[in-house]
Amino acid sequence: MASETVSNHQEKALALLQADAEKILRLIKVQMDHLTMPQCPLYEEVLDTQMFGLSREVDFAVRLGLIAEEQGKVMLGELERELSALHEAFTNKQQ
């Protein structure tokens, strides 16, 4: 019974983290569509704040043993790659 509860908490934690990551990914995709992020410091600040918040959530979940450290790294790494692609796309547009 206890292992079912732990497993349920782990699944719920992962689902919540993935939902938060999806929200950030949508913000990135909107900016990719418009390539305006570097022109909008407020939007960049929002993305940075969201990424920082998610990294803290992931760290907390890892420390509680709700998700594996590798799962958290993969989740954050994917978002960082998308953010990097956004910056690269905007830079290429400017050239």
Curated annotation (Swiss-Prot):
It holds the Pfam family DUF1507. Gene3D superfamilies: SO2669-like (1.10.287.750). SUPFAM superfamilies: EF2458-like. Belongs to the UPF0358 family. This is UPF0358 protein BA_4159/GBAA_4159/BAS3861.
